[in-house]
């Protein structure tokens, strides 16, 4: 039996040391530590989604470049609109949650999207002004924006499609503020028109 000895090495937090066969020799290498928790436990924030994909992922790179060019996310929203910033974020979130799944457009394929609830006029009337501002129905005399929202899920397109119902529901609930900025947000110009 070969004699062994113990050594201690420091390994970065996101890596692990692993013995591997390389060129006929056994060597100790550092490899990325894989988080095996379900994706819905790993991705709770937009930042989590960016980290899951990595800074070199094209969607993350584009977002970071635009934020840098605009001198911050707030300036980017002023430059391009909150809905555009929200779309960029939702692309990243969707890509991360789908873990490599992309629609193939086959006849038997299902794609899922978040679905948002329409409030009754009574429920709407009990909202704060800020809550009312975030509802699609505020532009109508009635808060029942039936024609305004019932079909809007189909307008999300395949870029924001999920591989299963659970992921779509999770994304809609967990990232509701980002979805609201994408789907429902009213620009300041539209607010001024409503006040007239």
Predicted region positions:
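Acidic, glycine-rich loop-and-strand cores that form catalytic or ligand-binding grooves
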Residues: 66-124
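Short acidic DE-rich linear segments
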Residues: 1-2, 188-196
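Short arginine-rich
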Residues: 175-186
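Charge-rich, low-complexity N-terminal segments
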Residues: 2-84
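A short, charged, amphipathic alpha-helix used as a generic interaction element across diverse proteins
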Residues: 163-177
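Extracellular/cell-surface secretome signature
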Residues: 145-147, 167, 179-180
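Short aromatic-glycine-(Arg/Gly/Cys) micro-motifs in beta-strand/loop hairpins
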Residues: 108-157
